[in-house]
Amino acid sequence: MTVGFDYWQVISHYPDYFRQLADMHREAGWKVVVISAVGDRTAGTVEADVRRLGISNEVEVHEVKFEHPREAPELKVAKCKELGVSVFYDDRDDVCRLLNANGIVAMRVTRQDGSTYDLGSERG
């Protein structure tokens, strides 16, 4: 099986937890991937950020590029399907709802700042 994690507001804000969770999944024989929706400002930065937080080099890092953050749900679903992801952790309700509607178990991560507005959560 394959498990996926979002970067921003997930790994970025809970690095110790998600590093351990990724390691546990890998030790159990699962493939682990990071899928992050990015805009122009953050494109090309996610892998370095993920590695800096101690996520194993065996974890694949994928960026999906949006023109507007509202495109993130569809982009993440498409990448999850391409990679065979069966479980995905994300902070956005709209992403989680669309993942679930497409047969992918989505685990919603509460943001540390308590915000819930999906489009305001992206780094751009």
Language model segments and positions:
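The start of beta-strands in P-loop NTPase/AAA+ ATPase cores
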Residues: M1-V3, V85-S86
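Alpha-helical substrate-recognition element adjacent to the catalytic core
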Residues: T2-E71
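Alpha-helical scaffold elements within enzyme catalytic domains, especially in hydrolases
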Residues: M24-H25, K79, L98
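Low-complexity, flexible helical/coil segments
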Residues: G39-G44, E67-E74, D94-L99, S121-G124
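Mid-chain, well-packed structural core segment of small domains
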Residues: E60-G84, F88
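Acidic, Mg2+-coordinating phosphoryl-transfer loop and its flanking beta/alpha structural elements
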Residues: L83-G124
